[in-house]
Amino acid sequence: MNRERGITLIALVITIIILLILAGVTISAIFGEEGPIARAQEASFKTEIAKAKEQFDIYVSEKKVLNQEFEIGTLNAGETSLYYNTKPETEIGNIYTVLFNVNKKYVKDFEIIKGEMFYFTQNEREAQWALEMGMKTNPYEIINGVLISSDKNLFLLDEATGTITIPERVKEVGEGTFAGLKGIKRIIIPPTCKRINNSAFNGNDTLEEVLILADGDQGVESIGNYAFKDCIKLKVVSMPNTVRVLGTTVFGNCSSLEKVQLSSRIEVLSNNMFQNCSSLKELLIPNGIREMKGFLLQGAISLINISLPASLEKIDNNCFYDATSSLQNISLDGSNQHFIVKNGMLLSKDEKQIYAVTKGTINGNTFNVPKGITYVGSGTLMPYTNIKKVVLPESVTSIEAGFFPWSVEEIEIHPNNPNYISINKQILSKDKKILYFCYSKELIITLEEGIEEISESALEKCNNAKTINFPTSLKRLKPQSLKGIYNVKNIKLGRNIEEICGEVFLYNFGIQNIEIDSRNPNFIAENAAIYTKDKKKIIAFVNNEATSFKIPEGVKEIKQSAFSCREKLTSIVLPETLTLIENSAFYKCSALPTITIPNSVEKMDGWGIFDDCSALKEIIVDKERGSLNGSPWGCIYGDRAVKWLR
């Protein structure tokens, strides 16, 4: 019967439409915004809004009658939950409990927050109709389940307690959504939220507690890069076993963090995850984790105990970089097949690689690398300032400069070592073509002629040097090869340089100028910047004291890390000829407040172009919205920082 009635109504509507058309009424008049169809939709919608308002008022009145202590400001309701201050523990409910007589088509789009009812819609007509009925809409910015970066999201902050409760309709906390916002002390994330994106809470310097809830297997599955970076008051993090992925530097610089409960479903602990977590004293790595990535614990100077599981298969060589000064105990599951702890050292099972050295292992001022060791990892001895001498055995085949402590005065290499020699406090390859490490404390350092390559961090511990004379034979500067050397202001490179990139100058905060021999066929240096010979690509800008720089017209590409770590720059002007900006181009330009991307740019290659630019709150793009992929390109403030002009 119902089916027949439905068919009859449809036939009637079709008949009316045909008659209207025959009478000369246009299709647009029938179906347009002012047509009868739209008016019928409006009337139906407004009827449901009116019913919702009435039922909400009745529900609130009933609660007040039942208990005079009921506070309307505590009433919250969504698709799966209902809460108010006098709610009995036995009561189960949700938004449908409140709006039981409203068309279910609409009920799911209502939400009660702090005693106010709102309607959520991306339909502009519905939003207007709701407002005409006195119904508030969209109190926070959500698009397709993603809570996006917007100042409107402060509505979710309970100013009395400093608590933000993420609403149930939120499936993802978007990139930079709450980054840098003040007054947040506690965050509650419901099981309905599946993802916390990059920099979501970056720089919340009042945040003390993060509560990530789960309901069985339902809950947050991934937490993005830098999500809680620079939350300097965050003390405790407890995550459910729903979490499978943790991004790089997720807790970086959380200097108050004392305890972390990790999910057992995570397989990889990402780079820099606990970087500079200087209050972290104990870390239990749950079984299930297979890999610990580079610089995972860098600067975790208070770490005393760490427990490693049977499942662990790989540890990056610099995982414990500058993190062992307080380390007293490394506990390793006895069934682990890949590592052993011996004489206070964490070693590979075959005893060929050192990963970490505990505090009690260091006696006296000499450290003898055990015989049989082939690889010495970065940062292993860095915290131990009492070490003056390091002895390397014949077996060592791979050296990283970061292995050695700042205090080292002598490195003795076994005369039968086939790979390395030591000359004038410089560790070189046997053929003298590669410089691996220089530890001279002289004011003027002259590198050996014949050197063709300088390795990563090779000069980092030449912290007294004011002048470094580079050999004319030099061909290649590897990434971070000029890291450190804070007192060297000017660099002169010869005509044979054929490999240099912006990453060479990462974490160098001293250089102010660079000169390259005019006969060099590959590069040219002007005004503290390095370009390809045709000046179409800028490789690096090196002046650490500069506050502004204008890239000359004609430059088409900004290469990777070109402006990285230029922390005093407050203005960078890009040319109208620019077409490409590569990843990390402006990494750690921490004083830069704004930048304009010209219309000529065709590609911004990488999510981390503005990574760690803590002051960057405005990216002006002289193009149509969405015409460049990757927005906001690593800016911690998310899309609220991006202004499209067209």
Locations of regions flagged by a protein language model:
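N-terminal single-pass transmembrane signal-anchor helix
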Residues: 4-28
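Membrane-interface elements of multi-pass transporters and channels
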Residues: 29, 33-34
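Membrane-proximal N-terminal amphipathic helix
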Residues: 35-69
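Intrinsically disordered, low-complexity repeat and linker tracts
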Residues: 38-52, 118-140, 640-646
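Periplasmic/extracellular, small/polar-rich flexible segments of pilin-like filament-forming proteins
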Residues: 61, 65-132
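Short acidic-glycine loop/turn motifs at beta-strand connectors
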Residues: 102, 113-114, 150, 348-351, ...
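Structural signature of tandem-repeat unit edges
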Residues: 130-147, 158-172, 181-195, 204-222, ...
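Consensus positions within tandem repeat domains that build extended binding/scaffold surfaces
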Residues: 174-177, 197-200, 224-227, 247-252, ...
